[in-house]
Each structure stands twice: as C-alpha cells, then as structure tokens.
Amino acid sequence: MTNNMNNYPLLSLINSPEDLRLLNKDQLPQLCQELRAYLLESVSQTSGHLASGLGTVELTVALHYVYKTPFDQLIWDVGHQAYPHKILTGRREQMSTIRQKDGIHPFPWREESEFDVLSVGHSSTSISAGLGIAVAAERENAGRKTVCVIGDGAITAGMAFEALNHAGALHTDMLVILNDNEMSISENVGALNNHLARIFSGSLYSTLRDGSKKILDKVPPIKNFMKKTEEHMKGVMFSPESTLFEELGFNYIGPVDGHNIDELVAMLTNMRNLKGPQFLHIKTKKGKGYAPAEKDPIGFHGVPKFDPISGELPKNNSKPTYSKIFGDWLCEMAEKDAKIIGITPAMREGSGMVEFSQRFPKQYFDVAIAEQHTVTFATGLAIGGYKPVVAIYSTFLQRAYDQLIHDVAIQNLPVLFAIDRAGIVGADGATHQGAFDISFMRCIPNMIIMTPSDENECRQMLYTGYQCGKPAAVRYPRGNAVGVKLTPLEMLPIGKSRLIRKGQKIAILNFGTLLPSALELSEKLNATVVDMRFVKPIDIEMINVLAQTHDYLVTLEENAIQGGAGSAVAEVLNSSGKSTALLQLGLPDYFIPQATRQEALADLGLDTKGIEEKILNFIAKQGNL
C-alpha cells in the first residue's frame, strides 16, 4: 500500500509530535482533515479498526500539540482509537503493515515506540496504570504530566472506578479524559458549554477554588455551603455525571465538543497546569467524517479491506462462523426453554448474539465490560433456577478467574461458558490469543471442559453443557466452521472420546479443531486418531488402551502446552505407571504475535506439514518407527 502524500501536504511534514508543535493553531483544522482522510485510505487498504480512530482525530492532534510527548506521558485505553496517534508519532509509513505478521501492532505497544507508554489491548487498564505512572513521576520530581484517555465503554468496568477512587484519594496530578462517543452530540455540547468549561478549567478559577478551600476549611458551615453551591453550578452548567466524578475527588470539566480543535487546545492548555486529579469529559462521534461509519459505527469498528468510495463492506459468503453456530443454537434453545439466559460482557456482535438479543430480549443481558460481574451475575441466576449461558472470549474470561472458582465452581452451579476465540485469533495479536483457558480451567474442581472438532460437535457440546447441571465450558475458535452437516441435538456421554481411525504404533489424541490435520496425517503415518472431546473429565480408559496398544502418543491442541490437555494425558500415564512415549503439541511458552491464523499455525509447526515434521523428529529421537 502506498498513500499519495501529495494529497496530504501538512501531514507529510509530521514525522513526530515535535513537527506537529511547529504548526500554527490555525493550521490544525486542515491537519485534522488530512489525518482523517489518511486514516480512512490506509485502513481501507489493510483492514483494521476504523470508526474509533476517526472519532479521536481532533483529540489526538490537540493532545500532542499541547503536551510535550513523550516527556509527558499519554496512555490510551484498549487502543482501538490510537491509529491517529501512531500516524503522528513516526509510524505513518508503517501503517500498511498494521495487524500483519511482523508489522506494527494494532494497539499501543511499549516495544514499538517511546510514545506508547503502556501496552494495551484489553479495556479499562489506563487509569490504574496512569495513576502508578503519575505517582512515580511525582516521587521523582520529574515534572512530567500524565494523561489517560478512556472510552465510555471501558469506563463502565469496575477496575476503572477502583482507579478513579484511588486517584481521588491520593490527589495526584493527572488528567483523565473520557472519550464519550455516543451516536450524537448531546444538547449541552455547544458554544456556551465550551465557554463555561474554559472558565472552570482556567488557572484563575483553580487558584480561587483552592485558596477559598484553605480559608473556608476553618469555617465549616460556610465551607459546606460553598461546596454545595459549586456542585450546583456544575450540575446546572455541565452534565449530571459531574457530581459522580467530583465525589470521587476529581475536578470535572465537560462535556465539551471533542471535534472542536480550537476549544480542545485551549481547554488542554488550561488543564495542563492544574494540580490534583482532573477529569475532562468530551463528546465525540464514532466514525466522524466518513458517512458510512457514522451511520454504522459498530459495523465499521473493525473492518476488512473495502472500497472507501462505495463504503460497502465485503460480505462473507463462506461457511458459517463458530460464533453464528453458537448464536443459532442459543436461539433454538430459547424457543423451547424460557429459563435459558444469554449473557455477554459487551460482545453481542462478536459472540453471535444479535439475533438472540432481538428475538428474546427478556432472556438477554449485555452487562457491559464487566467480566467479573458477568460470571457472578450468572451465579445468581443459576441459584434462582435459571440456566445462564455466558458468551465470552477466551482472553476475557481470564479477567473473571476468581469468580469462576469462588462463585461458580465451589458451589457446583449449572453455568455454561461458551468460550469464543479459543486458540489462535490472528491479527489482534498477543493480547487476544485464546492460549490459556484450558490450562487455567483444568485445575478447577467440578468443571467440565469440552473441545469440539467441528460445528456439529460444538452444538452437541453446548447442548450437553446446558443439560448437565454442572459448571461446563465449550471452547471454540474464531472464524469459519468446517462445513459438516448439523444433526439433531443429543447429550454426549460426559468424559468419553470417539475413535475415528484405527492405525498402528502412533496414536494422535486430538483436542479441538485441528482434527482435519490429524486425519490427513493419519493416512500417511498409518496412525490411530481419537477425537478426545473432553479435557475434563478426560477419558482415562481410552488413554490407557492407547498406551497399551501403541508405541507413541501425540496430543494435539490449540492451547498452551503447559497445563493444557496434553498435560492431562501425561498425568494419566504417570498415575497409571505407563511409560509410552508422549509428544505434546500445542502453543509454546511465549506470547503469540499477530499474524493470520494460517501464518501463525505454520510458524508454530501446528499446520499439517509442521505436525508431521514434529512427529517424525520425535520418533527419530526415540530410536525407531
């Protein structure tokens, strides 16, 4: 991809924020226009996150214009909105490689740039990390400023409010910017509100406010009256949210128009010199400046390559995704059972729950970015006699580990976890790979863990988990299913595998959707293939039979080898006193970088060719075949 920089005369001059700060203020609107157009052109040719970045163009320009980055430290929450930040901080020419193998990261990444203060990917971490960074700077008398940018979705998480509460108590100098990108600018975001916000963010108001507090502290009745007066003024002039953040110890300003570059620069210039925790609430429009994205910000959140002129996203006419298979199964169950409840922590579209939410709104809950609450909410529903199904990405279930153990498993409650994005997820990289769920769930008593090899088996396992009356998890990958015929639902025998092919000497014990590679290899190696189905309880009887009748056992999974399904097989062999040679194939002991799924599997030696090479090398080391 090459962008014609003749179309971007100002942007072509910007190779770092230092270059940006050389511009006159009256040049900033043109720069914003060019930056937005460049972002659209780039992402349309490479794929990636689009709508969020389009909405933060003015904010990004204003922040780097006012603050002396990287000396002043700027922290982006999640990172979807940070593409303009990457473009302005020396990575413009590398945008063609974003989310690709060996390319720049889709999120801010410390190893990539000194301007990326915090590596991110998951939500709601910015304020906690920012507070720690601000405290460290304060103790070192560094004189640097700390700014955290968090979205209206991410700030709903409990972790964000824990950090706000702590920051208010410490009274540390830092600025939190709430990027509120609802569908439209609210009524009170206009010239008057911007003017009032400039007054409240100014140094004169701040000095008078702090000085009067010192005096009035000695006269409690007057102090309380003035405090209530100030709160009333802010409540009238600003939004109801101001009271909440003021009570947490922040000086709240806003909401203000996040697309007015002149006002943002003036506001941030004022706020840069204020002491204590500051909170700036800006209103932006997701997809700003590109009509199709403004109309459908969810559809244009993450996009494949597309034609920016037509604005039409390519349709997926291939096999259904595992997410759709799950969503269809959930609808099928809801038609028969009013007690089934579908729950998602802000992943309705990604988890395939759109149709379910529309057809069965009373049986659907989107609890926002609140994974811990999600799991314990499901616990309560189960106690109340309902049948909760938690649809959650593998990487996000990590955030609710204590709730999984303490609230679900210890009480042995019938909560079904539909774990999407298990295994290699591809372009989103290390923060989103579903590499650890088998390992961290396998050690939990009462858990049933299932690994389908295709979409029909996935449906049967979901049904089995729904019917079993215990904590159960079904893990399935991102992307398209195999294309097998779907059969009527029936409960699988728990803890039992199925023998697919009988061979000699080598037995491949498959856990999950790498089964096609195992079957392809079995013909060449005359290997036995078993679809293990259950990681827990594991089929001990089958493992012992295979160990007695074969020279080599090979376990195959898309999970970390350490603590994974292969480790469960090793434990069975050890406890049974079997000495059969065991090769465990899975994800290695490092974080898997971004690449397509096919590229990643090839690099890891988990494609058909790589698996064959690993098996043959293992046997060669053992001495014979």
From Swiss-Prot:
Organism from which the protein derives: Haemophilus influenzae (strain 86-028NP)
EC assignment: 2.2.1.7
Highest rank taxon of the organism: Bacteria
Cofactor(s) this protein requires: Mg(2+); thiamine diphosphate
InterPro entries named in the record: Dxylulose-5-P_synthase (IPR005477), THDP-binding (IPR029061), Transketo_C/PFOR_II (IPR009014), Transketolase-like_Pyr-bd (IPR005475), Transketolase_BS (IPR020826), Transketolase_C (IPR033248), Transketolase_CS (IPR049557)
Protein name (database record): 1-deoxy-D-xylulose-5-phosphate synthase
GO cellular component: cytosol
Binding of Mg(2+), residues: D152, N181
Lineage start: Bacteria, Pseudomonadati, Pseudomonadota, Gammaproteobacteria, Pasteurellales
